[in-house]
Amino acid sequence: MEKQRELRRKSREKNEIPVVALVGYTNAGKSTLLNQMTGSDVYVQDQLFATLDAVSRRIETAEHTPFLLVDTVGFIRKLPHALVSAFRSTLEEAVLADVLVIVNDGASEEITQQHDTVVQVLSDLGATEQPRIEVINKCDLYTDEAGAPMLIPGAVRLSAKTGEGIAELHARIAEQLQKTYAPVTFVLPFDRFGLVGQIRPLGRVINEEYTDTGLELTVVLANADRDRLVSKYGKEILKG
């Protein structure tokens, strides 16, 4: 567990922003969902392993918290051993992600079995600590309008094709990220400008304003980094 936390920490340092990974059974609609959420045009095909490499797009929450949305290879039951190494890089995206979005095919009669497979694969990979957001996709194709969402309690009901429910998913992602990342305003007098070089690399600067006494710097960064800075330099570096 500690090793996985360290890997995620290094991944955040490399990307500078949190990572949200779309995972799910093959053909659940992950690539279509990524396209709908980001306005991109990732290749979409109704076949096994249409997505072999991890594809990522940078977007923001309504609160201006940036994150990488990553599309991963679709899982299947009894993945052939010979293919595991080929998929290792994209599977590792799930392990290193800060939040997992599990995309389920609401139009499939085997949704429960497919969901169980995804949960088992995530467990096998060691991706067990991250918060998870359950999604039931293809609500425009449900044969049982009321039944499908009930198979996975608390799941977001949406259609990656039509866009229905996308706003709720964005809100759920933002809620999870706010537990880890948030905008913080630092108040730095002229004699503490040396801290700017330490703060900037930790997150994304969304505003900086010079005053008569120094600089007010607003950065989206991990709560853990904020707490570490406050512990080292005192609460006076925070506005308010």
Residue ranges and their predicted role:
Residues 53, 88-91, 116-119, 167-170:
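Generic alpha-helical structural signal
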Residues 78-81, 109-112, 144:
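Conserved D-loop-proximal element of ABC-family nucleotide-binding domains
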Residues 91, 95-98, 106-127:
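A glycine- and small/hydrophobic-rich beta-loop-beta segment
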Residues 81-85, 113-116, 168, 197:
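Generic recognition of short, well-ordered alpha-helical segments
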Residues 73-87, 118, 132, 154-155, ...:
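A beta-strand-loop signature enriched in Asp, Gly, Thr, and Trp
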